[in-house]
């Protein structure tokens, strides 16, 4: 039996659709919990990160991530010992994975959404 795995696609969420898009996925928990957590993780991972505009990406498998909208790398240092340079996209994916994992240990529907988003984004990252 042969199975063919399809590549997970990503699409930039247009500026005019950003608010509605994240509201449909996360509700008020996006601006109150998820977004600040992602920004904090990015700051912890990279002393090069000092804020800025983030691009929102919708994944073909239902996942979502956001990444700094700049064309440069970020020096990172992680608690697991990794030190190196990540692209802005890779920093965003990493920060979102950390945030989803952390927030998935809460209670209620938002924690479940974060757990699901973690696995969808991880699937994309490993693709």
State the predicted function of each range.
Residues 26, 42-46, 97, 104, ...:
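Hydrophobic, Leu/Ile/Phe/Ala-enriched alpha-helical segments that form helix-helix packing faces
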Residues 29-73:
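Amphipathic, interaction-prone secondary-structure segments
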Residues 18, 50-53, 90-96:
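Short runs of predominantly hydrophobic/aromatic residues within well-ordered alpha helices
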Residues 3-18, 104-127:
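Low-complexity intrinsically disordered segments
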Residues 76-114:
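Compact, glycine/acidic-enriched structural inserts
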Residues 23, 48, 58, 69, ...:
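Compositionally biased, low-complexity repeat tracts
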Residues 6-9, 22, 59-62, 83-86:
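Short, functional N-terminal and low-complexity linear motifs
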């Amino acid at each position: 039996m042969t199975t063919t795995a399809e590549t997970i696609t990503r699409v930039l969420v247009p500026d005019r659709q950003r608010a509605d898009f994240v509201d449909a996925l996360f509700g008020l928990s996006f601006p109150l919990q998820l977004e600040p957590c992602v920004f904090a993780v990015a700051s912890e991972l990279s002393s090069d990160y000092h804020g800025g505009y983030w691009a929102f990406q919708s994944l073909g498998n239902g996942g979502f991530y956001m990444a700094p909208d700049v064309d440069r790398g970020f020096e990172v240092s992680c608690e697991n010992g990794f030190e190196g340079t990540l692209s802005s996209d890779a920093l965003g994916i990493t920060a979102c994975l950390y945030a989803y994992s952390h927030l998935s240990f809460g209670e209620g529907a938002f924690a479940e959404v974060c757990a699901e988003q973690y696995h969808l984004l991880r699937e994309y990252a490993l693709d």
